[in-house]
Amino acid sequence: MGRDIPDNETWWYNPYMDIHPHWKQFDQVPAAVYYSLGIFIAICGIIGCVGNGVVIYLFTKTKSLQTPANMFIINLAFSDFTFSLVNGFPLMTISCFMKYWVFGNAACKVYGLIGGIFGLMSIMTMTMISIDRYNVIGRPMSASKKMSHRKAFIMIIFVWIWSTIWAIGPIFGWGAYTLEGVLCNCSFDYITRDTTTRSNILCMYIFAFMCPIVVIFFCYFNIVMSVSNHEKEMAAMAKRLNAKELRKAQAGANAEMKLAKISIVIVTQFLLSWSPYAVVALLAQFGPIEWVTPYAAQLPVMFAKASAIHNPMIYSVSHPKFRERIASNFPWILTCCQYDEKEIEDDKDAEAEIPAGEQSGGETADAAQMKEMMAMMQKMQAQQQQQPAYPPQGYPPQGYPPPPPQGYPPQGYPPQGYPPQGYPPPPQGPPPQGPPPQAAPPQGVDNQAYQA
């Protein structure tokens, strides 16, 4: 039994859709699956719109948060907000409850285009965030790597252009946008095995997925290695630090652990969100096509759409200043995201240790604390290098000490049997009794005065 899909009936809208024959060979998905997907997408869409909307509002209204690095957070929130609004609730939710796509071919292409642009934009924005954090933490003393509003704006423009280039191809015939999975949402056509579609899928896989993931892995791996190496160096220098420097070092160690954890969470979240989708697309092109069932195709869609919820939590709510603004403007949001009091105090201590002028570069308190700690370590290392080496270079001089003269000592020296046995002779008799004899006074000095 094929899937019950209306195509030639007369409705107040045109339900006719171009559906790939691959999907028609499967039995109809149970109604409970459609309703479950509709509820899930509605929840993701509402939370994604509210969460990312709050991020955009607070970052644009709070002057202290309008830093170059936070421009990437705003762009990511805008991308996820649009992704949740268009590709989640209400279009896909309505289609799931109707059990088929109800908006026609033109809307399918627009839906797929918007999902492609803002989905790829989220990936590329996360890549730019990883590059910025690598420059701040992994190479903090490089003046040329300092982020500015102009540089951040140029990088964001590049993200928009890059995402649009790869997403707009199917509109002009390089691939296509079509229904997928349970036929309630549209995306790239990864089922058709012709040269055009295959080249489109491969190029997107390499340049829009693998390249960003390699950059993200490289940046966060080097961040973890950098903070680990500096922690070891700081432990070796701990004995030479005063109380203030030691307090900064301890705060930096806390920042290291937090940054390492966040790095692992970011990479894991990225892989869970987008890797299943990439695997299904490659499997459909180069693997057994029968493995790409409606369920196998729809599950990665759910992971990808849920990423719009994860991103504001990871990139924004972990920001201490952002949490303060949430607590003052939207305290009800934090009721579901309680934080350990010690963690909040550590964040405040980290910020208190850093002068206000040093936080204007856009980095978070953790990144700024790490930057100051590494600057202090590099200063100490430079002082060590300025001290003269001991012993000085070139000492002792070459050829010193001089070699002994040739033929010295003479052959056969000392003579055999020398010194003679029993020489020198041991003293005879018991040791002398009484105190040791006293030295005579110098000439012209009274003996009694000398003894006194």
From Swiss-Prot:
Biased composition (Low complexity): 376-388
Molecular function, one GO term: retinal binding
Keyword Manganese: no
Main location: membrane
GO cellular component terms, A-Z: cell projection; membrane; plasma membrane
Changes after translation: Contains one covalently linked retinal chromophore. Upon light absorption, the covalently bound 11-cis-retinal is converted to all-trans-retinal. After hydrolysis of the Schiff base and release of the covalently bound all-trans-retinal, active rhodopsin is regenerated by binding of a fresh molecule of 11-cis-retinal.
Covalently lipidated residues, kind S-palmitoyl cysteine: 336-337
Disulfide bonds: 108-186
Biological classification of the source: Eukaryota, Metazoa, Spiralia, Lophotrochozoa, Mollusca
UniProt protein name: Rhodopsin
Pfam families: 7tm_1 (PF00001), XYPPX (PF02162)
